[in-house]
């Protein structure tokens, strides 16, 4: 046999011919909209195009260039907000071209002032004019941050579609190696040597240049963490985290802006507990074991080299065994340690009393205070001290673990992955930090009375059977547009002839259904919950439920009316509540708008996880998990919370019945069922085998 060395680019070329069309071209759920909605939507979209430069012929520029905020002060419902903004703006706002991060004090102060200016505009026209003014005159990153939140939070923009963050900020979702290739093609005006281009995974397809992209390797993850780089760097997962912040920023004051004050801290805990549980499942199937722990007084073992760049500087790098306890961090380390110890002292006392609050830690509602404490959000303090975010545990921890030097001034800093919600999930130490926070909150959970048999029992209702289709994951190619990363000429900005797309394999799963047999003695509205949890730990030993309760990941919640006798309920994975379809590209949304339609999930469920990440990547022989199905009586939310049923679906705690430590003997009741399942993986186990790096020739036996 002779060995033929085949260039990886040619392998990629062969693979590209077998790539199925992106699935967004088929069967995407849409909703009809009227002409007024379409006009609003197109105006909102126009401000996202080529965000790093201005179009002097665009409508927004003509409006924003000369718009006078002060002269229009009567068009804002809160005049003090306008005055506060103008005071900051005239003393000097953040210049254009600088990197923006909400985790730095002066930038945060300006961004909140800008958001409030957007938020208190009396009508959509004033909002659009104000946003146009900011698009022209304000720092690009700050504008986008405030604009995203305002579109989500304003009543007159409710339901409008926002572009996927990875289209707006490609530099935060794509390694610099790929964007360098994009810039090269742009600078060469599309000139391509076909042989050389194939070698580097670059192709011209129709009106687009397509760039094959791997996930980061051991250069970025100098440890075994590269095994799940496809998870860390998934553009849908990172967008999900960004949207979570957009819907409920840590600086958000519920008294001032809106709802959820009574459950805000609970939402914080539930979000991170579920994110860590989902991450843990991915670690198990990849043989990475338990989530590592760290100490503020010892080197951090897990290094990370982001391979990302900001406006002027590359992202900071953290080597393995990074010594965080150094002279630039002493003060922050002391604060972080004191913050943790103070919380444990509160728990030992059993109560907290300060900031006009008195909390009993034996009360289940205390979770709201505990979540607020760890987020250090605006609802924790009274009105006089709501801006004490510099005393935030999260912000200080991100700065210490990010390993960046101290900022040069209020606007100049070396960015780290932990400085942005769009990039935080790429850094493995992020999960170690939030696992640490969740473990502290679980210390509080130990003070809660576990559910007893009567709490969990459903009189007259029994789950007789649960059947689950084969669970199988696979990797598939997906294209996403990175055209916003390039600068274009004045001539081309109106109608640039080409688009730039990155093609990358992403984790997905085959559709499946869960069939539930229920025998009932009564006719009643019942809630069904489906969870996925580990059955064995990283060493292969069964995990007792008493130690495993907070590792169950909630897949679905739905209400079904059961009738006397035998009931057969089939739930399709595509209908699971906590997931959505992937975002459509802006180019596809424009086509839908011309037909009077919008993508339903992008309009209604932007803050949920993509369906394709529902299951952890399986293994060839099937990785064992357990599916938990639970049915209980439905209790509607209070009337005042009905508009928010998508977030607060019923009156039970988030994650119920796994919202507190459990007594396993009470989880063997007729209205509960544990079903052993296996998650298989079909095709290549590791996505980098789809796109072999160009610098590694492949040997093929002939």
Curated annotation (Swiss-Prot):
Compartment(s) where it occurs, according to its Swiss-Prot or TrEMBL record: Secreted, Extracellular space
GO MF, any single term: nutrient reservoir activity
Signal sequence segment: 1-16
Tissue specificity annotation: Fat body.
UniProt entry keywords in alphabetical sequence: Glycoprotein, Secreted, Signal, Storage protein
One Pfam family from the record: Hemocyanin_N
Subunit structure: Arylphorin is a hexamer of subunits alpha and beta.
Protein name: Arylphorin subunit alpha
Annotated organism of origin: Manduca sexta
């Amino acid at each position: 046999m002779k060995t033929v060395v085949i260039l990886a680019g040619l392998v990629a070329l062969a693979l590209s011919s077998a790539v199925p069309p992106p699935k967004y071209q088929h069967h995407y759920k849409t909703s009809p909209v009227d002409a007024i909605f379409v006009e609003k939507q197109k105006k909102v979209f126009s401000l996202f195009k080529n965000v790093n430069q201005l179009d002097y012929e665009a409508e927004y520029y003509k409006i924003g260039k000369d718009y006078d905020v002060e002269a229009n002060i009567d068009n804002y419902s809160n005049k003090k907000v306008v005055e506060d903004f103008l005071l900051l703006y005239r003393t000097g706002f953040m210049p254009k071209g600088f990197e923006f991060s909400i985790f730095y004090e002066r930038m945060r102060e300006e961004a909140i002032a800008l958001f409030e200016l957007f938020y208190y505009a009396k009508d959509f026209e004033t909002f659009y004019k104000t946003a146009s003014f900011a698009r022209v005159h304000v720092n690009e990153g700050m504008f986008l941050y405030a604009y995203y939140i305002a579109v989500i939070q304003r009543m007159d923009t409710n339901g409008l579609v926002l572009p996927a963050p990875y289209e707006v900020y490609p530099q935060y979702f794509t390694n610099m190696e790929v964007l360098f290739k994009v810039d090269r093609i742009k600078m060469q005006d599309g000139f391509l040597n076909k042989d050389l281009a194939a070698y580097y995974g670059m192709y011209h397809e129709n009106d687009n240049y397509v760039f094959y992209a791997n996930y980061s390797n051991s250069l970025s993850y100098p440890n075994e963490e590269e095994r799940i780089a496809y998870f860390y760097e998934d553009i849908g997962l990172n967008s999900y985290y960004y949207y979570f912040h957009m819907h409920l920023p840590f600086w958000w004051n519920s008294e001032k802006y809106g709802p959820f004050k009574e459950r805000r801290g609970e939402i914080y805990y539930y979000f991170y507990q579920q994110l860590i549980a989902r991450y843990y499942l991915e670690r198990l199937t990849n043989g990475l074991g338990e989530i590592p722990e760290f100490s503020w007084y010892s080197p951090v073992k897990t290094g990370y080299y982001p391979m990302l760049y900001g406006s002027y500087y590359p992202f900071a790098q953290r080597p393995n065994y990074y010594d965080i306890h150094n002279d630039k961090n002493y003060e922050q380390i002391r604060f972080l340690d004191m913050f943790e110890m103070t919380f444990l002292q509160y728990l030992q006392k059993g109560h907290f009393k300060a900031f006009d609050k008195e909390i009993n830690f034996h009360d289940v509602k205390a979770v709201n205070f505990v979540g607020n404490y760890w987020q250090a959000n605006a609802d924790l303090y009274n009105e006089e001290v709501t801006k004490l975010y510099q005393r935030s545990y999260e912000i200080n921890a991100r700065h210490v673990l990010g390993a960046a030097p101290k900022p040069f001034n209020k606007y100049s800093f070396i960015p780290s992955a932990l400085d942005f919600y769009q990039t935080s999930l790429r850094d493995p130490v992020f999960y170690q930090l939030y696992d640490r926070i969740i473990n502290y909150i679980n210390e509080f959970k130990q003070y809660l009375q576990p559910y007893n048999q009567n709490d969990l029992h459903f009189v007259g209702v029994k789950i007789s059977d649960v059947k689950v289709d084969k669970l199988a994951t696979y990797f598939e190619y997906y294209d996403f547009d990175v055209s916003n990363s390039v600068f274009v000429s004045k001539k081309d900005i109106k109608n640039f002839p080409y688009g730039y797309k990155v093609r990358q394999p992403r984790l997905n799963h085959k559709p499946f259904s869960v069939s539930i047999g229920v025998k009932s003695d009564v006719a009643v509205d019942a809630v069904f919950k489906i969870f996925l949890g580990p059955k064995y730990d990283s060493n292969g030993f069964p995990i007792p439920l008493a130690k495993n309760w907070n590792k169950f990941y909630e897949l679905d919640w739905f209400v079904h009316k059961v009738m006397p006798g035998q009931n057969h309920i089939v739930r399709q994975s595509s209908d699971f509540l906590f997931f959505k379809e992937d975002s459509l590209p802006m180019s596809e949304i424009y086509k839908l708008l011309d037909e009077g339609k919008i993508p339903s999930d992008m309009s209604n469920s932007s803050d949920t996880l993509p369906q394709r990440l529902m299951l952890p990547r399986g293994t060839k022989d099937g990785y064992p998990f357990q599916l938990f199905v639970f049915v209980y009586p439905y209790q509607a939310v209070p009337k005042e919370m009905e508009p928010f049923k998508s977030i607060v679906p019923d009156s039970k705690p988030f994650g119920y019945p796994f919202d507190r430590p459990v007594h396993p003997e009470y989880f063997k009741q007729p209205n509960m069922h544990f079903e052993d399942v296996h998650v298989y993986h079909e095709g290549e186990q590791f996505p980098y085998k789809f796109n072999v790096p160009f610098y590694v020739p492949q040997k093929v036996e002939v």
